[in-house]
């Protein structure tokens, strides 16, 4: 059975970005390149209008590459329910108030029943401290919290 994944904007940026000389960024770019074929083979990828909006910003050539990369993905709705959950995540300090878009990524994926959120955002979404608060808030609101992982988490064997 194919697993449902929400692809957050940072993953799209690493996939389409110009090659970096920074060893950490280059490693993430390579992991994302290795992960990307799984999106058509083993996973069912989804994004939101927020990912489309974020992917369309900046240099027009790079924006076109990002938008082309996600053109075939399912687009999840941004509902009032998702907006309320995002606000609850911010209120619980799961994600800092200054980053409401990050909370909305999580909320949209949870409301939509995604199994995973795939992100390189270790600052506000995918770190051990925020993940605890995010999970508690999402579950307290009556939803199952998607597993929050980087792309390279999918590069091993599935049991």
Identify what each model region corresponds to.
Residues 1-47, 54-65, 91-97, 131-134, ...:
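Short, well-structured N-terminal submotif of metal-dependent ribonuclease cores
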Residues 4, 44, 117, 146-147:
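A residue-level structural signature of the nucleotidyltransferase/glycosyltransferase Rossmann-like core
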Residues 46, 76-77, 147-149:
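General small-molecule cofactor/ligand-binding pocket signal
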Residues 49, 79, 152:
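Residues at the C-termini of beta-strands that transition into short coil/loop
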Residues 68:
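An acidic/histidine-cluster motif and surrounding catalytic segment
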Residues 73-130, 155:
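Active-site neighborhoods of divalent-metal-dependent phosphate/nucleic-acid chemistry enzymes
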Residues 126-147:
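C-terminal end-helix/capping segment
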Residues 142-159:
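Short, C-terminally biased terminal segments at protein or domain edges
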């Amino acid at each position: 059975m194919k697993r449902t994944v929400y692809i957050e904007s940072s993953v799209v940026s690493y996939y389409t970005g110009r090659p970096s000389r920074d060893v950490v960024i280059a490693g993430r770019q390579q992991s994302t390149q290795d992960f990307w074929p799984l999106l058509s083979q083993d996973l069912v990828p989804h994004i939101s209008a927020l990912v489309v909006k974020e992917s369309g910003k900046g240099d027009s050539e790079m924006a076109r590459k990002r938008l082309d990369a996600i053109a075939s993905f399912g687009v999840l709705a941004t509902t009032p329910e998702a907006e309320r959950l995002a606000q609850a995540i911010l209120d619980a300090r799961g994600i800092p108030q200054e980053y409401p878009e990050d909370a909305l990524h999580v909320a949209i994926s949870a409301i939509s029943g995604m199994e995973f959120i795939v992100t390189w955002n270790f600052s506000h979404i995918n770190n051990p401290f925020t993940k605890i608060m995010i999970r508690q808030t999402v579950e307290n609101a009556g939803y199952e919290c998607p597993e929050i992982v980087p792309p390279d988490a999918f590069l091993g064997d599935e049991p």
